[in-house]
């Protein structure tokens, strides 16, 4: 099986403001991707897979999205992150799930966050579900 620890486009903004993250670390079973921005302004993704029980495998996915800003210190403009938003997702899959079962789970995840659906619409509008 080919490695899936490769760079990918995290934010697809029609090519003009795309954010690509590249592999940066893989230690203790945790894969980390980071954007090329300065460390304080970088987008970061981590993913780990653990055996959560004899019957289940647990994926833990975390995404950090920075609010990019600058700060002037001593007449020098420095890049900083004004704040960060964090996404944490846990996915538990029975070890006896087939590849087609897992493909269906991925399709459900993609549908969950598809543009125009209620959850991403609420997040994009900084509002609730109503």
Swiss-Prot record:
GO molecular function: RNA binding; structural molecule activity
Example GO BP: regulation of translation
Keywords attached to this entry: Capsid protein, RNA-binding, T=3 icosahedral capsid protein, Translation regulation, Virion
Record's keyword annotation contains RNA-binding: yes
Classification via Pfam families: Levi_coat
Disulfide bonds: none
Places the protein is found: Virion
InterPro entries on file: Levivir_coat, Phage_RNA-type_capsid
Coiled coil (UniProt feature): none
One GO CC term on file: T=3 icosahedral viral capsid
Chain intervals for the UniProt region annotation (Viral RNA-binding): 32-105
Family statement drawn from the similarity comment of this UniProt entry: Belongs to the Leviviricetes capsid protein family.
Summary of the function given for this chain in its UniProt record: Capsid protein self-assembles to form an icosahedral capsid with a T=3 symmetry, about 26 nm in diameter, and consisting of 89 capsid proteins dimers (178 capsid proteins). Involved in viral genome encapsidation through the interaction between a capsid protein dimer and the multiple packaging signals present in the RNA genome. The capsid also contains 1 copy of the A2 maturation protein.
Assembly: Homodimer. The capsid proteins form dimers that assemble by group of 5. Twelve such pentamers are linked together with free dimers. The homodimers binds to the viral RNA via an operator hairpin, but also to many other RNA sequences in the viral genome; this interaction probably shifts the virus from the replicative to the assembly phase and ensures specific encapsidation of the viral genome.
UniProt name for this protein: Capsid protein
